[in-house]
Amino acid sequence: MKRGQQQKTKNLVMITATLSMFATGITPSLEVFAEEQAQQKKVSTTLQNENSVNVENRVFAVPGKGDVSQLQNIERRERNFSAYEPTGLYAKPNEQITIQVQGNQSIQAYIGTFSFDASWREDSKIKSFTLNPGTNTIQSPNGGMIYFYNKQQGGTIQTTVITGGTATPLFELGKHTKQDLINMLNQYPNAHAVELKGERVLITASPVRVKKYLIDSNTDPVQLLKKWMRLLEFKIKYLDYLKNK
């Protein structure tokens, strides 16, 4: 395959969103009289409880994705698939994260997100760890989102984050709706990042960008992920065509 063709057929699977598609206005905050504030707070708390979405998960069945480097070589891709399996948990700088791995196989853990916390040339900012069966403690001076990677071909490894980590919005295709994402953003307005996960697509962006360029622009995250997945499928088919040509 020619270099130019390779460049045109890059297979993006992990997309760190810079989302700059739409412009939006600003919704002004409401002012209330002093005598109404107590009642307003009570109503707000009630609505928040009704609209809350349980996004915090600490037990994960980490799927085996195989060796992504081997897959890259077999399919002649310039950039390999993302091995990241998001947890929706954020590790603060130097925060100790205790993780329990069941079974007799090790997995990898990462703290930090490429092209979000660091560019592709700043690998040192993204910390990787080998998690052996049993209890493991990890930490990163930079902090970042926590991810797992199971190199096994198929199967799952149960992994539990026992202590550490802060919940952040994690939108999953087939599990959540646009309203769920809105509720997540309301629950965690100061989250380190927001992640949108499709079958083979992972988008990472700041809450401000997600709200501005998705929610306020009336873009459905479900349709956004489906479009990226269709684009990915097209690129894979095109790569197969070029490989067999």
Enumerate the language-model features and the residues they cover.
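Short, flexible loop/turn elements at secondary-structure junctions
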Residues: 3, 34, 152, 207-209
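Bacterial N-terminal signal peptides that target proteins for export
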Residues: 3-14
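Beta-strand-enriched, solvent-exposed domains that form extended recognition/catalytic surfaces
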Residues: 37-175
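A general structural signal for short secondary-structure junctions and capping/turn motifs
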Residues: 89, 138, 185-188, 193-196, ...
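Catalytic cores of extracellular degradative/oxidative enzymes
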Residues: 192-245
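Low-complexity, Pro/Ser/Thr- and charge-rich linker/hinge segments at domain boundaries
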Residues: 162-195
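Hydrophobic alpha-helical targeting segments used for export or membrane insertion
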Residues: 12-22
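Sec-dependent signal peptide cleavage junction
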Residues: 22-42
